[in-house]
Design a protein with these regions (language model features):
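Glycine-rich, proline-tolerant flexible connector loops at the mouths of alpha/beta enzymes
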Residues: 40-50
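Alpha/beta catalytic cores of nucleotide-metabolism and tRNA/nucleoside-modifying enzymes
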Residues: 3-5, 19-37, 49, 56, ...
């Protein structure tokens, strides 16, 4: 921590396994070394992503540190965020995998999405994100980086295109063709009609995708 002139934060799990829950001890040492914020995922290392995150066990970390505490794991809507905060005593939540293909989700959970922002068409949002990635990474790397996001969007927005269209979307090397496919595959309906409420769940749509 002393080697840099920027704030240093730490993310950890509850411990190695149920027999070694050492997050409180590690958090105490981290704060003593100068760590300014700690995030705890409510599973052990050995759980990977199996089972449910135990937000209540994060409270033991809250009891021993004074720096901001963030709780993470299985948080995907305002209700689960509220429960995680209540059970852990944390100051904030971190949304992870639930935001894959749903970049609007943190804003919905926090209640900070501007009025009208969800009126953008689903295919418009995906196109904007795709072009932003190409602009940031450049064409060769951006094309590859974008593919995982396109896959997540297909899942989150419950798009089920014909296999040949899905394959072409995930393998096309010309950005112009990818944008054409996005316009064809993803709904032209506003996100406010494509997803349901604060949970960010999708309504299945069929905009001529059987081709």
């Amino acid at each position: 921590v002393a080697a840099v002139d920027v704030p240093v934060t730490l993310k950890m799990r509850l411990g190695w396994d149920d027999q070694m829950i050492n997050a409180p001890e590690l958090a105490t040492r981290a704060v003593a070394s100068g760590i300014c914020m700690i995030t705890v995922h409510g599973r052990t290392r050995c759980q990977f992503y199996k089972g449910a995150a135990d937000w209540g066990r994060v409270r033991a970390v809250r009891d021993v540190i004074h720096v901001p505490l963030v709780v993470n794991g299985d948080i995907g809507c305002a209700d689960t965020a509220g429960l995680a905060l209540a059970r852990s005593g944390a100051d904030a939540v971190m949304i992870g995998r639930a935001s894959y293909g749903a970049p609007w989700l943190p804003g919905l959970v926090a209640g900070t999405v501007p009025a009208g922002a969800m009126d953008i068409a689903a295919n418009g949002l995906v196109s904007d994100h795709y072009e932003a990635m190409l602009s940031f990474y450049g064409a060769p790397l951006g094309l590859k980086q974008a593919r995982k996001h396109l896959g997540w969007y297909l899942t989150t927005l419950e798009c089920d295109p014909a296999p040949r269209l899905r394959t072409e979307l995930m393998t096309a090397t010309r950005p112009e063709r990818v944008l054409e496919l996005i316009g064809c595959i993803f709904s032209s309906q506003p996100l406010s009609r494509t997803i349901i409420g604060k949970d960010g769940k999708a309504i299945r749509h069929n905009d001529g995708l059987a081709a």
